Amino acid sequence: MITNTYQYMTDMHGFLQRVASAQRRSNIVKFRLGPKKIYMVSGEKNIHAINTPSHSISPEVFFLDVMANVWGAKPTELVKFRQDKSGRRKNPIPGHELPPGEPRLWHGQHHIYSEFLQRTDRANFLTTKYFDLFSDRLVQQPLNEWREVRLCEFFESEMAEAALEALMGPRLVELNPGFWPMMWEFARIAPQLMWGLPRWMNPGPWKTQAEFQAMCRRYIDAAAKAFDPTGPEADAEWEPQYGSRMARELVKWATENLSPETTAGMVATFIFGTNANSVPMSTWALMHLVADPALYRAVRDECLAASTTDTVTGRRGFDPQKLFGMPLLQSVYIETLRLHVSINVTREVTQPITLDGFLLTPGSLIQAPSQIGQYNEGVWSAPGHPASEFWGYRNLKRESEKPEFTMTGKTSSFFPFGGGPSICPGRVFAKQEILMTIAALVTRFEIELIDWIHPDGIKSNRPAQNDQSLIGAVGIPPDRDMKVRWKRLW
């Protein structure tokens, strides 16, 4: 038990390798994390079961841990969430209706994401806003001049700032000198906060958390003073104080239901969640393309076929519907997430339930590690292309004259955004953001690989690999940078 607990908390990569080995004999592996029984599950039927709404399994335990340890929610706030068993849907779960006047907390938050982030028209608006901001940054690169660039540095500054402004407006950066170094440090330590270790054991992450949340508090307070809820921008899809309508509605919901400190913690976690996934995935996707010039050219041809030019302004862009439907681009996107997103989807057993012949008792936890399914050779391997390696064409069906994108037979082994009622609400925007980013770069630039380098700039003797310290918690950034030379063509 001590070995399992210690390895689970300090070496998730090694622990998941042990689980994968054990799951060759059984789809369910039990271990103890301290006093808690945890069942690691795989297999199509089991994944379907934990992602299907059920009175026997609840996804809320993970979010309560995030609220407690990453947001920094107060005990009284956590009690209110625990007591709200009315569910996330429009109508309360029968038998769990709340008294009149009591807010349905899970439903309220879910409604904000569903209405203002997931809805097609609003996701498209945010994507367009992001693309315009990102394009404005790209045109600042010298035209027809070769320049050396570090890809990780580029994405962590230019892409991240465009995405942040699209979602949250410009004020976070304007109000907080040193915002980006602090944000990326918070992204690095957020998984450590999840374990809930006492401050005296590891004070560094708590200090970073407090400093980053203070930055977010400045943004919230400044926006509250500057924004007029009765003015002409009351229903605007974007304005400079809060940024997007989604951010404004989310902060409004939080200020009505949470303390100012917890509201700042929620905003900090939202910022981390958006940037710490889409930015490293875009970085990885371009790294894979640059490392394979033939694949780079093939993806560029697809993106050029979806490009457009405004007849009035001459501004170039893309037909989103056409771009997002390009088969090879979609295959590269899926392959990138398959290899570089590692999360443990977590559920709590609330009533006795049987999976694969095992009786799981209330209070137990179920975890489905996405990495195990996404590296399953039986599902993903192809002749000459093992599941452990990147192959951009892996998700194409080639029987027809034109390649077709397909995920047939793979969906239960691919869940980088989680699943069920707690699936990541930002997945639509994230996908469109990543695809637009790659399309903009491969069509606008000639890019050539120079070297793989360490973060300090020293040449590396190998390509980048997943940063193993973040496995199991997030989109995994590369542990090396890629130095390239590029030239902007237009």
What are these regions (language model features)?
Residues 1-94, 413:
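N-terminal membrane-proximal hinge/A-helix region immediately C-terminal to the signal-anchor transmembrane segment
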Residues 8-17, 310-357, 370-377, 404-405:
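Conserved cytochrome P450 K-helix E-x-x-R motif and the immediately C-terminal K′/meander segment
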Residues 33-37, 125, 142-163, 177-178, ...:
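Cytochrome P450
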Residues 184-255:
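Cytochrome P450 catalytic core segment centered on helix I
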Residues 247-302, 367, 426, 434:
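Central I-helix of cytochrome P450 enzymes
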Residues 295, 410, 421, 427-471:
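Cytochrome P450 heme-binding "Cys pocket" and the immediately downstream C-terminal segment
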Residues 368-404:
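Conserved cytochrome P450 K-helix/beta-meander segment immediately N-terminal to the heme-binding cysteine loop
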